[in-house]
Amino acid sequence: MKKSLKIIIPVVVLVVIALVAGFFIFNGNDAKKFDKEYSVGEDNPFVYRNAKEVVDILKNGTGVVYMGFPECPWCKAYVKMLNETAKEKGMEKIYYLNIKNDREKNTKEYQEIVELLRGKLAYTDEGKERVYVPYVAFVVNGKVIDHDSETSDIKEDITPDQYWNREQKERLQVKLGTLIELVNKGSICTDCNK
């Protein structure tokens, strides 16, 4: 018995160490990849998720879900503020979905995301709801408690740098910070939009 314990315990310890190391390496790869796409630094909290995984988070999870794509200049500007606020508030993970492909192909998962966000999306000229980006959803126990998509459908001729002046940035970061704190606590805000 003692002999088998001497073998089993080191094996279990090695497996646990390998799993923990794998977790950090995997998360580090997401952060590096995200930094290459968005230039936010490698110490960012963004972890990649596919559309199916985002559907599951929206249905059952708790967290912050950011949807965008790196070719979008509004997304690049927005994500820097989201990243900064998330780090200030101790948010360890923000789930990221590059939604461009799913949206263009109108995949089953994209349609499900639209259905789960019904009433929290902008409309196309044809009157259909659509995920315009940048879009961030704040989810607690499978309930979207709030979202932000302020610059997802800007129609005027303005650049992100022109739009995001100091006051606009501060206002957004206060809103994001409040919602991140609620997600971190697992709370539901009933008057966040007031």
Predicted regions and their residues:
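Non-catalytic, surface beta->alpha helical segment in thiol-disulfide oxidoreductase systems
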Residues: E126-K194
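N-terminal targeting signals for export/organelle localization
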Residues: M1-P45, K194
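Thiol-based oxidoreductase modules, predominantly thioredoxin-like and allied folds used
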Residues: V40-R49, M67, M91-L116
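Typically the conserved alpha-helix immediately C-terminal to a functionally engaged Cys/Sec
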Residues: W74-M91
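A short beta-strand-turn-helix
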Residues: P45-T62
